[in-house]
């Protein structure tokens, strides 16, 4: 809940149930902005509160009826590439456009997407024949321009990501049974990832 202070230094933690735990030192593996918030932030160096968090991401978890059938490596049967991190990022010019579009419009309609299919290595994650995939998407901003919010953009962004994956694996869209969308704002509110920065 918060970092306790004593004698000008961190002295322990106050937990959400009201329990206080004293400690000789407190180690925080968290975003500096979150640490200053938990500690009250009054006497911290300015660098902590001004820490730049501009690498927001968009995440989506999908349930799939079948494995993606990638045009470059055809086949719906599990193959080594299905058990690897699959990065959909064409040449540098593509990445440059994705970055520029996100800076101007808040998110890229053609982002860089990493596809992970953990059910290919752990068959307990999905029913027999089905799979789950995690889509890690880059070139999305936390703060959208023009007064737009992620509540109003998240479905369109998710559709754009699915469109992109479908260009590389034509059966992808039709194989999606369900999806869970995590915009940069969702990543912050649900997991405490400041500005959606993973």
Predicted regions mapped to residue ranges:
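Mid-domain catalytic core of redox enzymes
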Residues: 2-126
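Short glycine/threonine-rich loop-to-helix capping motif typified by GTGT followed
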Residues: 5-11, 146-150, 182-196
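Conserved FAD/dinucleotide-binding core of flavoprotein oxidoreductases
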Residues: 33, 37-39, 63-65, 127-160
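Charged, low-complexity, helix-prone segments enriched in Lys/Glu/Asp/Gln
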Residues: 48, 97-102, 153-157, 187, ...
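Contiguous hydrophobic segments
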Residues: 92-96, 134, 159, 193-197
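A glycine-rich dinucleotide-binding beta-alpha-beta segment and adjacent secondary-structure elements
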Residues: 108-116, 169-198
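Structured binding elements
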Residues: 165
